A protein has these predicted regions:
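N-terminal Rossmann-like NAD(P)+-binding subdomain of aldehyde/semialdehyde dehydrogenases
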Residues: 1-59
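A general structural signal for well-ordered alpha-helical segments in protein cores
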Residues: 2, 25-26, 32, 108, ...
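Hydrophobic packing residues within well-ordered alpha-helices of enzyme cores
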Residues: 5, 108-111, 137, 157
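Generic secondary-structure signature for well-ordered alpha-helical cores
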Residues: 10, 34, 38, 116-121, ...
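Residue-level signature of the cytosolic catalytic core of signaling kinases
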Residues: 18-21, 62, 129, 182
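Conserved small-residue-rich beta-alpha loop and adjacent elements
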Residues: 48-118, 165, 187
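Conserved NAD(P)+-binding/catalytic subdomain of aldehyde/semialdehyde dehydrogenases
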Residues: 68, 118-190
Length: 190
C-alpha cells in the first residue's frame, strides 16, 4: 500500500503512509470488530404514553442494514478514507460500492484488486474512473451515500443524489496546505 501511494504522490514517505493510511484504517476496523455486538444489540425505549407500559407494552429499536452504501473517497488519504468507513458499513450489515479518486490510480487499482480477491462483487464493488464516472456513481439509487472531498464537488454529489432522495453524508474539505521550500521545484509544486 505505501508503495502505491508513494507512486501516486510522486513520493510520499512510507512512514507517513503507514501511520496516516494503514494504521488508522486498522484502528477503525478493530473498533468496529470489537463493538459490533454492542452496536447491534436492541435498544430499549420508554413507552409513551406511560399508560401503555402499564398495559404491558414494550418498546425497543432493532437495528437493520440499510442495504447498499455508496462511498466516494478522496485523493489525499485514499486508504484510510476508504477503509475507515468500511468497518461501520460492514458492522451494520450493509454492502458497499466504492468510487476512489481518479488522482490515485495505483492505490485505487490496488484496493480494487484487494477487494476482488477477498469479497464477492455483491459485498464490495469498486468502480474506478474519472469525473464522468463519479457523476454517474453519485446518481445511483443508494440506500446511503458517503462523500469525502472538496466542497465544490460535494455540491454536485448532493444534487445528483437528491434526484433519488438518497440520504447523504458529506465530509467537506478542500484545503491541503503544503510547505514549499526554496529548494523545491516551484513550477512542479504549483
Amino acid at each position: 500500500i505505501p508503495v502505491a501511494i508513494s507512486k501516486d504522490f510522486s513520493h510520499r514517505s512510507e512512514t507517513s503512509s503507514l501511520l496516516t493510511d494503514v494504521a488508522s484504517s486498522i484502528t477503525s476496523l478493530k473498533i468496529a470488530k470489537n463493538n459490533i455486538k454492542q452496536w447491534m444489540r436492541p435498544s430499549k425505549r420508554k413507552v409513551s404514553p406511560s399508560i401503555l407500559g402499564l398495559l404491558g407494552a414494550k418498546l425497543r429499536v432493532e437495528y437493520q442494514p440499510l442495504g447498499t452504501i455508496g462511498l466516494i473517497s478522496p485523493w489525499n488519504f485514499p486508504v484510510v478514507l476508504t477503509f475507515g468507513p468500511l468497518g461501520s458499513i460492514f458492522a451494520a450489515g450493509n454492502r458497499v460500492m466504492i468510487k476512489p479518486s481518479e488522482f490515485t490510480p495505483r492505490t485505487s487499482e490496488l484496493m480494487k484488486n484487494m477487494f476482488e480477491d477477498n469479497f464477492s462483487e455483491e459485498e464490495v464493488a469498486v468502480i474506478t474512473g474519472g469525473p464522468e464516472v463519479g457523476a454517474d456513481f453519485s446518481s445511483l439509487p443508494f440506500d446511503h451515500l458517503l462523500f469525502t472531498g472538496a466542497t465544490s464537488i460535494g455540491k454536485h454529489v448532493m444534487r445528483a443524489a437528491s434526484d433519488n432522495l438518497v440520504p447523504v453524508t458529506l465530509e467537506l474539505g478542500g484545503k491541503s496546505p503544503v510547505i514549499v521550500s526554496d529548494t523545491s521545484n516551484i513550477e512542479q509544486s504549483s
